[in-house]
Amino acid sequence: MTTPDLEDKSFDSFGLDDRLLSGLAACDMKQPTLIQNTTIPLALDKGVDITAKAVTGSGKTVAYLLPIFELMLRAEKEKRDIQTALIVVPTRELCEQVSKVITKLTQFCPHLKSLNVTQQLGDDVISSLLEEKPSIIVGTPSRLLKYAKEMDCSKVGYLVIDEADLLLSYGYKEDLIELSEMLPKTKHTFIMSATLNKESDLMKQQFCRSTVASVAVTAAEEERKLLQYYVKCSERDKFLLAYVMFKLQLVKGKTIVFVNEIDRCYRLRLFLEQFGIKACVLNSELPIASRLHIVEQFNKGVFNLLICTDEANKLAEASKSASKQTKEVSRAHEYSSTRGLDFMNVAFVLNFDLPLSSRAYVHRVGRTARANKAGTALSFVVPADQWGKDKVAKLDTAKRDEKVLKKIIKNQESQNMEIKPYSFDMKQVEGFRYRMDDAFRAVTTVGVREARVKEIKTELLNSERLARHFDENPDDLKALRHDKELHTSKVQAHMKRVPDYLLGRKGKLDPNVFVPFRKDDNKIHKKYTKKKKGGDPLKFKKRK
């Protein structure tokens, strides 16, 4: 079935338990989104299995959690056994995020306990927690499969497969099938994703019962306030445009920059440091505790510029090439900055490196324009005739940028969305090139490697040795910043300032707009000083 035209409803109209309504109110959730309006009644009233496709940020997590909680509470009232819910997600970060949402929604239902099996706890600790029979268990397929033998799988009544397409692309298909064979055939299944393909249809046949409701909510139906642009430029000009955009503050609000390789994220960060532009990096090499803390600080506004490595691109390449190291692929299985993570109030997304597919693009730009807020996405595209001319700035995946762009445009048009070309006034930008070249030369390959090692060592120290200290002294945690300058490349102080001659006339203050505290040339004071000139300062002259 497709999404029907629905009138605005409130959560009260679903007949939810008062405790859940109180949890929603505490989370400041007043109005259900379109996907929630569609999914919740189907799950509660008709009891069918559901496959749902909706854009990121549309509220899919709450859409499957609420009906599960409501059915559990109804079973409690009817004095029936509460069946266990398994929530399968692709990454550890997403496990943590889903667990937090569960805690908030069930804060008035203390008997509904949840467990995240991807926590950094020992196997014995996880096993002991499973013996307490939590109502909701969250984890990645491999972790859930590991502990499934210790659980009473016959009690599992609900199965959620979140970010289904990503689970398949990460090679979890066999784990999912093995897990499904251990679960009852009568389980209530939810398959959720921002993009569903033919492989997802196979999952429907594998996991769902005979009665399945398919829900699809397009970006146009969600009325997303997303503006999308692309700029065709050379590989070196990417750095020039990024410098101009961030140094002149042409971009306002929180920004996420996506690159395709870990070395690229450190090169870009060191490059921006040359101009005094602070940024933080997020990639799979960092410890899980650091990654979660970086996302938390970003959401709190501690820093506004985040450079993310899109590991999904690496996995796509690795699946095509048997020579790729399996260690890198397995590490990236547990991480993806483009999927599921709830980056809050992101105003701008910059695809510094274009993704390898239109599907990956959808997930990237989905970080902004969430929850009915406005957002902008800009993508740098390297023309085929410009690729490979700069050995240092060269990126292998950029060779296919123009082909990928055509697929992205076609995909967006099918969603009734538009991506427009954008052109910078290169005559004005050209004046900044010599400073960009100086900064680019200062960031060497050795400097990038040293920055990468230094960052990992620092984050490991923060994650392991200081974890207990921060628990006892939470105020000290405020001093921990992830966007501090790395200083592995020599930073020239003058590069942090933008000379007036580069700004041109537009960069200078307009005397018709600028209002000083004192008027020019002290004209008022001169008026009186002229009258007093030549007079006796000791002589008092009475006014007429």
UniProtKB/Swiss-Prot annotation:
Pfam families: DEAD, Helicase_C. A motif (DEAD box) lies at residues 162-165. A motif (Q motif) lies at residues 9-37. One of its GO terms (molecular function) is ATP binding. Keywords: ATP-binding, Helicase, Hydrolase, Nucleotide-binding, Nucleus, Ribosome biogenesis, RNA-binding, rRNA processing. ATP binds at A54, V55, T56, G57, S58, G59, K60, T61. Residues 525-544 are annotated as: Disordered. It is an enzyme of class 3 (hydrolase). It comes from the Eukaryota. Residues 225-430 form the Helicase C-terminal domain. Its EC number is 3.6.4.13. This is ATP-dependent RNA helicase DBP9.
